[in-house]
Amino acid sequence: MKKVSVIMPTFNNGEKLHRTISSVLNQTMKSTDYELIIIDDHSNDNGETLNVIKKYKGLVRFKQLKKNSGNASVPRNTGLKMSKAEYVFFLDSDDLLHERALEDLYNYGKENNSDLIIGKYGVEGKGRSVPKAIFEKGNVAKADIIDNSIFYALSVLKMFKKSVIDKNKIKFKTFSKTAEDQLFTIEFLMNSKNYSIKTDYEYYIVVNDFESSNHLSVNKSTGNQYFATINEIYKAIYKSPIYKNQEKRHQLAGKYTTRLLRHGQKKNFANSKMKYEDKIEWLNNFSKTINKVPRDSDKYVTQIFNLKLEAIRQNDLLAVMIADKLL
C-alpha cells in the first residue's frame, strides 16, 4: 500500500503542468511510497496537455475522462476510486508542493494518529489569498475545529485519511459547481476526530495565474446550486456521528454561519450592482436555507452579524442593506 496518493485534476493546462508535476515527483518522501494520479477532464487544447502528461509515462498514473464534466468533482472522485493509499492529498493543477510536503505531513499524521493533516499555505503572485488564522498557533497535534479556525480553511488542498472517506462513502457532489470542496471537507470533519496542523514550511503554494482561464471551476454555479450545497453542509453538521451533542452541533452550525456571512459567495449582494430581481432571488434562496438551521445556533454567530442574520431570516432586503452598512 502506498502511503499517499496525490490526486490532481487537469484541464487545458499545457506546458504549465511541468512545474506542478515536478513539484510532486521531487518530494523528499521515498518515490515508491507515494503516487501522483492525474485525471484529465477531457482537455480540448489540441493534445497539448496530454502530450505533457505522456512525457511522465511510468512516473504517474493517468486517466482521461470521456467527456468534460465542468469542474473538479468528477475528476477527483475518479482519482479517489483509483487510490488505494493510506492518505490522499488533493492538488490543483496550477499549484505547487514544497519538497517536504508529503513526508512531513504524513509523518506528523502518523505520530498523532491524524485523520486530517493541514499544511501551511503560501501564495505566489497576486489574486487568490490563503487562510492565515488557522496557522497562527504553529504546529498543532490535536486541533479543534473552532479553536483553531478550521472552518476558515475548507478547501480540499490537504491530506485526508482514505479509510475515513471509504468508510463513510464521502465523495464530491456533482450537482453544484461551487462550494463542493467545502461540503467534502465538512463531511469529512463531521465523520472524523483527529486533525493536525503543520506550519514548519509553506507546504502548499497557491499559484495565481490570471493569464490562464483553464481553471476547472470556470463553469459557475447558480444561486440554487450554491445554496443547495450550503444546505447539505448544515445537514452534515446536524447528522454528525462524531459530534452527537446537540448543543455542540448548534455551536458548529453557528460558527459556519459566521464564516458564510463573512466570506460566502456574494456576501455583499444587498448593496451590490446586482439587478433588483436578482437580489430578491438570492435573498429568497439564502433565507430558505438559513431558516432550515435551528435558531439555537444563532447565539454562536459572531455578534456583529446578528442584525444581518435576522434580516436574512426575515427575508427583508432593506434590512439586509442597512445591516451591511453597519458592519
Curated annotation (Swiss-Prot):
Effect of R262A: No change in activity
Keyword Transferase: yes
Recorded consequence of changing I322E: Increase in activity
Job of this protein: Attaches beta-O-GlcNAc (beta-O-N-acetyl-D-glucosamine) residues to the C3 position of poly(RboP)-wall teichoic acids (WTAs). Attenuates immunogenicity of WTA and protects S.aureus against adaptative host defenses by allowing bacteria to evade recognition by preexisting anti-S.aureus antibodies. Also protects the cell from podophage infection.
Effect of R76A: Loss of activity
Cofactors named for this entry: Mn(2+)
Name the record gives this protein: Poly(ribitol-phosphate) beta-N-acetylglucosaminyltransferase TarP
GO function term, MF aspect, one: metal ion binding
Self-association and partners: Homotrimer.
